[in-house]
């Protein structure tokens, strides 16, 4: 279900839902109710003191994010009572009707005491884009995962093993006004993500403002012990409790009405997919080696270092970002499919995550990055029809994308555009090397250049150590290293390493042209040259792309060649890029100097057969083929749900193609959480779609792997 912005009215200057005729917070004591119902209702002050914060993170789940009040109150408690703690807070919330940025900013003026938190939320707040949005708050001490969409569907897509919850804030509009949310399916989904513990403080707790019988019975049916408690203010009662068991409770003979609770909607049986197993959450490694210092490697290094993990970054060249990440400007945008897909969701949520990193590191300065928007032009009738279908099928807000005429496109671009198209106002461009330099400027990250890796071997730990685990031995031109875990992020060069030789990666040659342009005229200049007259204000994209001028150069391209492997600049590729630019912006193309004055950058994109990135645990190829061999003859063979044969503590991030700026950072956050055993920023269908073993399974089903 696609999220839609909330429709609000503002009695007394406070937000109220026009759709549900209900308030977002108590206008008289807007934080006291949260502290009573949710903070104290989950017994969090005592639980944090007596053991919950002994672990390296606390996970809280919420229904109904609203204005974020509950999160702010919890952050205030932690900052007040546990300011020196190194543990992190993971706050998982859902919202089907998110406030617009303007409405949220208005609503948050009611919380001046939380200004330090509210500004961070506003800086990172996305439009109404379906999916999981990961926020980095308080310098990485808090991670908000905001699922925009239906609460039940959002929770059902999460892995209980990797997204378990310690405390539930069951909030939202009252059951009488929003019965669709408070359903048996919601309670079943909440139960899946809950856990028991012999030490009561460590078991999953819950609290809620409502005393509705449907809520009480629904939670009891799903394994929660429920009790009434004193409510806040004029509300006499509330409910709270803790998780007891995953199986449904036995028939209650003393109170038989408890058994009349509606049952969750039966789900169609799902074929087991044990081959998409993820490693069980484990203790964070002390030292991780990352092979490759492009976008994938540097973003992963930062995500791990932010969590206190020491990282050694190995680069075979003499500096970072020399290969596909080496362009001066890379377009930061999502080219969406006609129908909603996992690929489209990854691109949209990935774009928003990259924007958060750019803002946190203050890179949106017009030199290292710029959120200037992007025009995707309909340069053919077929593309025009595709764009119309996209708008009709995706129901995205105009804050994400809107249709524009040729005249509107020309005004936005500041040059003549002969095509209609789509305008993506949140898109922009990034200098990948500048982004990577900012990310790896961290005391826990060590960069080693001229370190081409030649061997990657799994070795037993030395005799006398306290663990029986194995460690990775990495041999490079700079010597030998050992590590608790390894992330391979060196694109198609990964195939040169023995454990990864079967990866289906393909290099795609691309040449980006750069043409010198005259410096832009200042506001005081009397004359406007043809160059400044057609200076781009936004990125234009059709069969190629062109970015606004930076450092008196116009960067545009790029060729797409699956067959040529030369890294030499080819004059005919300049001609191709000029022809492509002429179709998109003829006046701009005419203003450029001859191609003999141009320069170029040749790189090789690393792509996969399905053009989705590879991100996740590395499979043991031979063991996979052996274990799942029956898929050759029966794709529905009922395999046991046992862990898949993975390479221990070996992870991959590659195959990002031309979309690395929007996929590599989010994949890095995913890998960092997977490696450290922390809650994941993506749901199970997405991690399945990124899983490195997916091609082995597809080829077995097609019987394309030799016996």
Where on the chain are the PLM-derived regions?
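Dinucleotide-binding Rossmann-like beta1-alpha1 core, especially the glycine-rich loop
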Residues: 329-412
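Helical element adjacent to the flavin cofactor pocket in flavoenzyme catalytic cores
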Residues: 422-461, 468-477, 481, 485, ...
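A short glycine-rich, Lys/Arg-flanked "PGG" loop and its adjoining helix->strand segment in the class I
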Residues: 183-202
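Active-site substrate-recognition segment that forms the wall
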Residues: 256-283, 289-291, 295-307, 316, ...
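C-terminal catalytic lobe of FAD-dependent flavoproteins
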Residues: 426, 591-707
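Short beta-strand to alpha-helix junction loop
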Residues: 207, 339-350, 377-384, 421-438, ...
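Helix-loop-beta segment of a Rossmann-like dinucleotide-binding subdomain
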Residues: 115, 338-339, 365-376, 400, ...
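The AdoMet/dcAdoMet-binding core of the Class I SAM-like
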Residues: 51-163, 184
């Amino acid at each position: 279900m696609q999220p839609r912005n909330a429709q609000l009215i503002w009695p007394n200057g406070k937000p109220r839902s026009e759709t549900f005729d209900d308030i977002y917070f108590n206008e008289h004591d807007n934080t006291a109710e949260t502290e009573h119902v949710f903070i104290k209702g989950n017994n969090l002050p005592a639980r944090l003191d007596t053991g919950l914060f002994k672990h390296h993170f606390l996970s809280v789940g919420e229904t109904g994010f609203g204005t974020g009040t509950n999160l702010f109150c919890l952050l205030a408690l932690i900052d007040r009572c546990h300011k020196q703690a190194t543990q992190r807070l993971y706050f998982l919330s859902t919202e089907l009707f998110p406030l617009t940025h303007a409405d949220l900013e208005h609503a948050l003026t009611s919380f001046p005491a939380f200004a330090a938190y509210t500004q961070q939320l506003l800086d990172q707040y996305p439009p109404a884009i379906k999916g999981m949005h990961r926020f980095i708050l308080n310098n990485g001490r808090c991670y908000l995962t905001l699922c925009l969409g239906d609460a039940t569907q959002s929770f059902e897509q999460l892995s209980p093993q990797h997204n378990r919850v310690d405390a539930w804030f069951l909030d939202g509009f009252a059951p009488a006004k929003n019965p669709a949310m408070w359903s048996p399916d919601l309670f079943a989904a909440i139960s899946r993500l809950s856990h028991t513990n012999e030490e009561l403080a460590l078991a999953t707790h819950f609290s809620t403002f409502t005393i509705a019988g449907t809520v009480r019975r629904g939670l009891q049916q799903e394994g929660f012990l429920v009790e009434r408690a004193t409510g806040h203010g004029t509300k006499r009662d509330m409910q709270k409790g803790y998780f007891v068991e995953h199986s449904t409770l036995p028939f209650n003979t003393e109170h038989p009405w408890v058994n009349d609770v509606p049952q969750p909607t039966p789900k169609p049986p799902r074929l087991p997919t044990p081959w998409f197993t993820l490693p069980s959450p484990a203790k964070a490694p002390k030292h991780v080696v990352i092979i490759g210092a492009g976008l994938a490697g540097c973003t992963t290094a930062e995500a791990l270092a932010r969590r206190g993990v020491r990282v050694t970054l190995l680069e075979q060249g003499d500096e970072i970002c020399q290969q596909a990440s080496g362009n001066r400007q890379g377009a930061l945008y999502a080219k969406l499919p006609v129908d909603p897909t996992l690929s489209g969701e990854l691109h949209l949520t990935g774009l928003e995550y990259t924007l958060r990193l750019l803002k946190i590191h203050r890179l949106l300065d017009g030199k290292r990055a710029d959120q200037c928007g992007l025009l995707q032009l309909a340069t053919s009738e077929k593309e025009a029809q595709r764009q119309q279908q996209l708008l009709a099928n995706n129901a995205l807000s105009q804050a994400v994308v809107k249709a524009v005429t040729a005249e509107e496109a020309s005004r936005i671009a500041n040059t003549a555009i002969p095509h209609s198209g789509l305008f993506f106002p949140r898109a922009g461009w990034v200098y990948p090397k500048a982004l990577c330099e900012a990310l790896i400027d961290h005391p826990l990250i060590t960069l080693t250049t001229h370190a081409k890796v030649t061997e990657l071997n799994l070795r037993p730990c030395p005799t006398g150590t306290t663990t029986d685990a194995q460690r990775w031995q990495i041999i490079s031109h700079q010597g030998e290293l050992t590590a608790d875990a390894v992330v391979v992020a060196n694109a198609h060069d990964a195939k040169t390493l023995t454990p990864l030789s079967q990866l289906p990666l393909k290099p795609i040659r691309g040449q980006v042209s750069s043409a010198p342009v005259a410096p832009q005229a200042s506001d005081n200049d009397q004359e406007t040259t043809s160059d400044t007259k057609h200076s781009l204000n936004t990125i234009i994209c059709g069969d190629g792309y062109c970015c606004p001028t930076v450092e008196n150069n116009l960067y545009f391209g790029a060729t797409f060649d699956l067959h040529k492997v030369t890294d030499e600049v080819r004059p005919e590729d300049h001609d191709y890029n000029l022809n492509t630019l002429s179709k998109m912006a003829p006046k701009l193309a005419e203003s450029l100097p001859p191609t003999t004055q141009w320069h170029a950058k040749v790189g090789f994109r690393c792509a996969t057969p399905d053009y989705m990135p590879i991100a996740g645990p590395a499979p043991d190829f031979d063991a996979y083929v052996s274990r799942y061999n029956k898929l050759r003859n029966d794709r529905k063979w009922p395999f046991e749900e046992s862990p898949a044969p993975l390479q221990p503590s070996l992870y991959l991030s590659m195959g990002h193609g031309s979309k690395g700026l929007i996929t590599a950072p989010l994949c890095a956050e995913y890998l960092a959480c997977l490696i450290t055993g922390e809650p994941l920023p993506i749901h199970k269908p997405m991690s399945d779609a990124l899983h490195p073993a997916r091609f082995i399974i597809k080829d077995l089903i097609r019987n394309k792997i030799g016996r």
